[in-house]
Amino acid sequence: MTVPCAALVLALGLAFGQSSQGNDEESEYSGQSITEEENSEDETTRSALATVTTEALAENVNSTHTNDTSNQVEFILMVAIPLAALLILLFMVLIATYFKSKRPKQEPSSQGSQSALQTHELGGETLKVPIFEEDTPSVMEIEMEELDKWMNSMNRNADYECLPTLKEEKEPNPSPSDNES
């Protein structure tokens, strides 16, 4: 940053120096005489400083161009890529909703649904027949069947575990201590 500032100060100094050199009449009145050698040396110095200043300004412009390029890359990374990702996501959602609405809606299956119709296939035709209450078991009937199964399994397992069965518990069996007395 100091090189561009120094180049700018040098360029301004040269500009003011040339404007004061343009007044030859003032230099004659001041009592100073400029010889041609001093004048040519002065011009050589000015041209050398001008080329150095131009090179410094060119470097400054090149570094600004590099900064602009990096700013463009940052802009692309920070704005353009997330925006493109958002557009792709939106496009995918729209396609999914389009295909979902285009697909024919299927009838829910009779199992687990509250549908009052049951499908039967006769030949090549499918008929929808209403489900009547006597055709479906109630919750209580299902629970009773499960309880019966459990009780039967308990009776079978009782023989192996040395637990008294229901029949043994119901029979009045005198205890051995009662027989001795």
Swiss-Prot record:
Phosphoserine modification, residue list: S177
Topology of this chain in the membrane: Single-pass membrane protein
Assigned keywords, A-Z: Membrane, Phosphoprotein, Signal, Transmembrane, Transmembrane helix
Signal peptide boundaries: 1-22
Polar residues compositional bias, start-end: 107-118
Membrane side Extracellular: residue ranges: 23-74
Region called Disordered, residue ranges: 19-47, 103-122, 161-181
PANTHER family membership: TRANSMEMBRANE PROTEIN 154
UniProt name for this protein: Transmembrane protein 154
Protein's organism: Mus musculus (Mouse)
